[in-house]
Every structure is written in structure tokens, then in C-alpha cells.
């Protein structure tokens, strides 16, 4: 009987540890970053237009599509920065004062995709995440929100946006990352930060 409960405990602890093992499966950024770097002139142009670091744009391209502009995910995300027409694409259109949403063919165009991806990063930083003071924390918050939504992130701190921002401002980058590991409902959220740092280090 004791052996049975010991085995159950081992399985339970293994499950708990694997839940937060954001490094598995392994990810080598070398090739994706190299392919993403070919779009750097466009990323620099889009970054300047929207006030977004082109290295951040390049890292997201490496993570999202590996530099392939024709990629369409099972969930319908399209192109280099894997934008969904009906969500992030629609948000960018609204920001530009346009109606509707971008087409799949538009999002497969590298220049249009990167421009709209940079615009969406700017929307996140200057909208739901506005007020975060630490630049590195802001970067982490932006990429987690890019991947899983700003609302999902902020709700791990508070149901009130301003209270959530104040709690975030009490954390440094490492503390913010640990919070995401422990509190964010999406297991890919801490993994995205981990991949972001690996991609930036590979540039």
C-alpha cells in the first residue's frame, strides 16, 4: 500500500514539474533567426514607423514562422508574424481607421505582414499594457500578450487593469517571468519569453 502511494506521489510530482518545463521540447534559434534576419530591412522600416524595436520584430518572426512568409497555422494565423485576420488583423485595421480585416493574401505579403505585426505590438504597448515602467518587463509583457492576449496576462495580477499594471511595476524582469511561469494559464506563455531571449541572444 505504501509503495502504491509512493508511486502516485512520484507521478504527481513529475506532472507538476513538467507543467512548468518551458524548455521542452528544445528549440534551437540559429536557423529561424538567420531566416528572420533576411527581413530586417522591412522590420527596421516598420519598427521606425511604429516605435517598435526591430530586433523584437525579428525575434517574433523567428519564433512564429521561422522566417517563412507563406506559413498558415491550424488556428488560421498567417505569415511571418502569424497574425490572425479576425483578431490582431482586425485590431490593426481599426487602428488605421479601416473597416473589415486583412485577407490571407495580404498577410502573406512580407512587407504588409511585418508592418501590421509592428502596429499590433504598438497597440499592445500603448493600449492595455500602457503604464508598465521597466523596459524589459514591458518587452516580456508585450510578447506574452502577443501570443496569448493582454487580458489573459493582466488577469493573472488583477481583474482591474490599473491594479494589474501597478502590481507589474512592483516586479523586475526575473520576478515577472517567474509570475508568468507560476500563474499564467497558458503553458506556452513562459516558453515564449524563453524563446524570445534565445532568439535575441542568437542575433
Curated annotation (Swiss-Prot):
Keyword Cell wall biogenesis/degradation: yes
Keywords on record: Cell outer membrane, Cell wall biogenesis/degradation, Lipoprotein, Lyase, Membrane, Palmitate, Signal
Reaction(s) catalysed by this chain's protein: Endolytic cleavage of the (1->4)-beta-glycosidic linkage between N-acetylmuramic acid (MurNAc) and N-acetylglucosamine (GlcNAc) residues in peptidoglycan with concomitant formation of a 1,6-anhydrobond in the MurNAc residue
Top-level division of the source organism's lineage: Bacteria
An MF annotation (GO) of this entry: lytic endotransglycosylase activity
Lipid sites, type S-diacylglycerol cysteine: 16
Signal peptide from the UniProt entry: 1-15
Location in or out of the cell: Cell outer membrane
Lipidated sites in chain (N-palmitoyl cysteine): 16
Entry EC no(s): 4.2.2.n2
Membrane topology, from the record: Lipid-anchor
NCBIfam families listed in its UniProt record: PRK15470.1
Protein family: Belongs to the transglycosylase Slt family.
Name of this chain's protein: Endo-type membrane-bound lytic murein transglycosylase A
Organism: Klebsiella pneumoniae subsp. pneumoniae (strain ATCC 700721 / MGH 78578)
Amino acid at each position: 500500500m505504501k509503495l502504491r502511494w509512493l508511486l502516485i506521489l512520484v507521478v504527481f510530482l513529475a506532472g507538476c514539474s513538467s507543467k512548468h518545463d518551458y524548455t521542452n521540447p528544445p528549440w534551437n534559434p540559429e536557423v529561424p533567426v538567420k531566416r528572420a534576419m533576411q527581413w530586417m530591412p522591412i522590420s527596421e522600416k516598420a519598427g521606425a514607423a511604429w516605435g517598435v524595436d526591430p530586433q523584437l520584430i525579428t525575434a517574433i518572426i523567428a519564433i512564429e514562422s521561422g522566417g517563412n512568409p507563406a506559413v498558415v497555422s491550424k488556428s488560421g494565423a498567417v505569415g511571418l508574424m502569424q497574425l490572425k485576420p479576425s483578431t490582431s488583423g482586425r485590431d490593426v485595421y481599426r487602428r488605421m481607421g479601416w473597416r473589415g480585416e486583412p485577407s490571407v493574401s495580404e498577410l502573406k505579403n512580407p512587407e504588409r505582414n511585418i508592418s501590421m505585426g509592428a502596429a499590433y505590438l504598438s497597440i499592445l504597448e500603448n493600449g492595455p499594457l500602457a503604464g508598465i515602467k521597466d523596459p524589459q518587463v514591458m518587452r516580456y509583457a508585450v510578447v506574452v500578450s502577443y501570443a496569448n492576449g493582454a487580458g489573459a496576462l493582466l488577469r493573472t495580477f488583477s481583474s482591474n487593469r490599473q491594479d494589474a499594471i501597478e502590481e507589474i511595476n512592483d516586479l523586475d524582469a526575473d520576478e515577472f517571468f517567474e509570475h508568468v511561469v507560476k500563474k499564467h494559464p497558458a503553458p506556452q506563455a513562459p516558453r515564449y519569453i524563453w524563446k524570445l531571449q534565445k532568439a535575441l541572444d542568437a542575433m
